Amino acid sequence: MKILLIDEMHPSIVKMLEKENHEVTYSPQITREEILQIIPDYHGLIIRSKTPMDRELLDRAKNLKFIGRAGAGLDQIDLDYLVTRGIKLFHAAKGNRDAVGEHAVGMLLALMNQLPKGDREVRKGIWDREGNRGHELAGKTVGIMGYGNMGKAFAKRLQGFGVKILAYDKYKRGFGDKYVKEVSWNKLKQEADVLSIHVPLTSETRGFFTIEEL
């Protein structure tokens, strides 16, 4: 099977595929135009998120059997058209959940304590003690919209901060436990001091989080 890798990957994946007698082309710097020219010759495609897998590209991939996504996000892939074409999709849904959970906590702490603003000002010789006072997380209510792998990872890391955690997921029920309370979307909006959004960008979620909605 001929497999094309179009993004930076760990070198071990090439050796692993070649060991299984696949013909591998590793081209992390390839452009979209170049992909369109050569993709008809390939049976497999391994990607990250640089190049959209849209109908134009997929129509050129006449012999494509599968796409392997090295990561969790699928917003750059036309999932419906993959089904129509019968192209299989593999992705690492849990691959970066710990990193995302930690990153989300770091961003929350930075925002609550005005660290980005304070950092910029101190670098300019400005010391605004009162203007940059932060807010403790303890006692606050954190709302999580979307309780998949990333939402759960974030909730797990919040448990030591003395916060109340509420979560809403349109497609899941019965996930509440002693740390996380499952609530409706309206209740989440009404009670949360902080809202953390953990849903993919899809036709359903694009443009959903407006000021009016929140």
Specify the residue positions occupied by each region the protein language model found.
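Hydrophobic Val/Ile/Leu positions in short beta-strands of Rossmann-like dinucleotide-binding domains
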Residues: L5, V142-I144
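Rossmann-like adenosine-cofactor binding region
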Residues: T51-L57, L166, K170-L214
